[in-house]
């Protein structure tokens, strides 16, 4: 059964777990600034020798997100393990679709991660083996 920790906090269960997967956007930061309560919680977990893994669905490589967190003022000790959906997608595509053609749906700023595939990017969607969607919003539907 899932336990709601809203009233009692993470500290009520922290001693029972060694590993914490923590989402970034909306949990650790809002895209502009860090949430002080969240960074305090991360500090408490590290003081208890807990393992932290920070996750995000950003279509960026892990190192770009680490640089972003550094610029926001987060100490490196908190983000030694960052995993992005962009990095996961890149690894999967490299293993399975490196020689296939694709059509990119999304803003140009999100394409940098996939530069190794640039030669396979095509302009006619009907000729694509797959779609690479880095954003699906009103402008793209």
What are these regions (language model features)?
Residues 1-138:
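HAD-like aspartate-dependent phosphatase fold
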């Amino acid at each position: 059964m899932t336990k709601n920790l809203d009233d009692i906090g993470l500290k009520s269960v922290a001693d029972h777990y060694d590993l914490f997967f923590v989402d970034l956007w909306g949990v650790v930061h809002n895209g502009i600034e860090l949430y002080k309560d969240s960074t305090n919680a991360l500090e408490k977990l590290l003081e208890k020798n807990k393992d932290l893994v920070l996750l995000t669905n950003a279509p960026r490589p892990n190192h770009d997100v680490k640089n972003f967190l550094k610029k926001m003022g987060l100490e490196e000790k908190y983000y030694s393990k960052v995993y992005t959906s962009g990095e996961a997608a890149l690894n999967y595509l490299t293993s399975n679709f490196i020689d296939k053609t694709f059509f990119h749906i999304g803003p140009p700023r999100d394409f940098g991660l996939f530069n190794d595939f640039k030669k396979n990017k095509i302009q006619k969607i009907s000729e694509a083996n797959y779609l690479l969607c880095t954003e699906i919003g009103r402008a793209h539907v």
